[in-house]
Amino acid sequence: HIQKGNLSVCIDTSPDIKYQFLKNKIKNLDSIIYTHEHADQTVGIFEMRPFYWKNKGKIPIYGSSRTIKALKNSYKFCFKEKQGYPPIMKANVIKNNFFIKKNKIKLSIKAFDVNHGLINATGYVMEKIAYISDCNNVPLKNLKYLKDLNYLIVDCLKLNKHPSHFNLEDAMNLINLVKPKKAILTNLHIDLDYFRLKKILPANVFPAHDGL
């Protein structure tokens, strides 16, 4: 979740998003950015309906053409009128650079492809913060987006190699290559213990946790 002034933007809608919003006292939502169409990134979309009513209008969502097409196919009720159930989402296919604006607040965003197994997911850079949630490779041509970062939030699913996600070695290789001021490892699976990671990671690299 990104908060800039009174602009509230969520990245993906995970299955537990209602719990996360309640626990972290997030009461407003203006837009949603999607990294890709897999269920663990999207199935919480139905929990967003209260924000449609609160905002008195459709919630703008952003994603690649592939992601938006998949969302429209999987969650038709969010986009098509049905008696008694108005569409709650307005879909926007992103380009490399776009922005989200609310009143005088503007969030500038750069989007780029990353490899995630058999598909491409989208990485985002928002004002010196990069977010790469599900990824097993960042194409060389897209490393330019990861220069001069304050924070790199990066996939780190497992200790051992995985066909569609970074493991710890992969994540650290990217961190050492692009040299952000700080890095946060996310998407941690059960074989990556939080407290053990804290002991072995460099001082500027942190394991993520709920509510961070």
What residue spans do the PLM features occupy?
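Binuclear metal-ion centers of metallo-dependent hydrolases, dominated by the metallo-beta-lactamase
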Residues: 139-212
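Binuclear metal-dependent hydrolase catalytic cores
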Residues: 1-132, 141, 198-212
